Structures are given as C-alpha cells and as structure tokens.
Amino acid sequence: GAAAAEGNVLDAKTRELIALAVAVTTRCESCIGVHADEAVKAGATEEEVAAALAMSIALNAGAAYTYSLRALEAYNAQKGE
C-alpha cells in the first residue's frame, strides 16, 4: 500500500513482483489476485512475473509451484488474456 511505497527506494513494479512472490510463498490466495493486478498496473511483463515466481518456487519447493500457476493465471486474467 501507500505506506510501503512512501520513501521506498524500490519502484512500484519491483515491489509488486516481490509482493506477488511473497503471496505465493505464504499461500495467500487473495493476496495473489491483488498483487497480480498491481503488477499489471505497474507494467510488469509476464517474463518478469515468471522470474519472480521462480524465486518463490526455488525457496518454497512444490507448494510454490502450484501457487505460482495460480499467480500466473491471475496475472493473465488481469491483463485480459
């Protein structure tokens, strides 16, 4: 949110990519939808989203893979694909 953005040296796209990866790692389904939407609004590409999700998979193994598929679906739904 706005509090996380204030004074943050990370740009909005980077923050949302991190947030999406964290949402996958913590298995927060509603968070995945929110941050997929915000990633689209911030201009994240599918390749960037996939790279962020790959980090989540590497750190969280199998469960992150399943949730990463959901995150990509949410991203594509928000993007209109």
Regions found by a protein language model. Name each.
Residues G1-E16, V40, T66-E81:
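Acidic, glycine/proline-rich low-complexity segments that act as flexible tails and inter-domain linkers
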Residues K13-A23, A52-L59:
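Alpha-helical scaffold segments that form or flank carboxylate-/histidine-based iron centers
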